[in-house]
Amino acid sequence: MLESLQKYFSVFVKCKGKIMSVKSVFYQTTLALVLASISYSAAAETIYAAASMTDAINELKAKYEKKHNAKVKTSYAASSTLARQIEQGASADVFISADLAWMDYLENKGKVSATHRKNLLGNRLVLITPVKNPIKTSIKFDKNFNIDAAFTGKLCTGNTNSVPVGKYAKQALNNLNWWSSISKRLVETEDVRAALNFVSRGECQLGIVYATDAAASKNVKVVGTFPLATHNPIVYPIGMINTDANSKRFYEYLQSNEAKAVYKKHGFSVLQ
């Protein structure tokens, strides 16, 4: 095809005052298109996801990159931290929050529209203890139980004012009438994985995390699961921040049957 085009174009064109053959123009145009194609295919999709999504998203990242010959960049932190970064202009294409509030926050800021967000996953709130030095008392999740006397160390969870797991934890502790008795023994962390690590290392005797995080560690065991009535439903919404074609393809992949199977494997419940 290249040779036939060269033979067909025997005329010359003027370019910026210089005489240039169509053959030269053809080569330059072809090179530009090739470079543009390479640049397009090399563009990375960026997902900002709640820390509790780390293992599931890492697995999906590998699958997506192989399937689409694409590159995916990940950023994991507390949903509050990620939402504020996106508000300030961080280059995220997709955002998965561990609660509705931080997705609502971005929608109110005009960073995501109602038509480009969906409730994706659910989770459970659990109480954990270190495997090597577990509490000895059996915990009962009712208002008459003396939680303060049940353990001697610290209780760790996310920041109770901003980090979703911490907010859920505070709701549960208040509804069980436990908050006032143990709030002074609370260690608040930057995200749920930090709380998990505190308990894993034995620095906190108890921790409140998601069931999926507890399942990801061999160094903690679940003492019990908080009743659903003690806190708001744990919902993970997904939002598309950048609405270009590549971002849309990635956004839709994260809701595909293949992705749902991975979420279930890691202990999440699928809401759609």
Residue ranges with predicted function:
Residues 5-8, 15-30:
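Bacterial N-terminal signal peptides that target proteins for export
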Residues 14-15, 36:
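Short, linear, compositionally biased motifs with a strong N-terminal bias
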Residues 31-37:
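A short, compositionally biased domain-edge/stem linker segment
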Residues 35, 45-67, 73-80, 84-90, ...:
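Exported/periplasmic ABC-transporter solute-binding proteins
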Residues 38-42:
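N-terminal signal peptide c-region/cleavage motif recognized by signal peptidases
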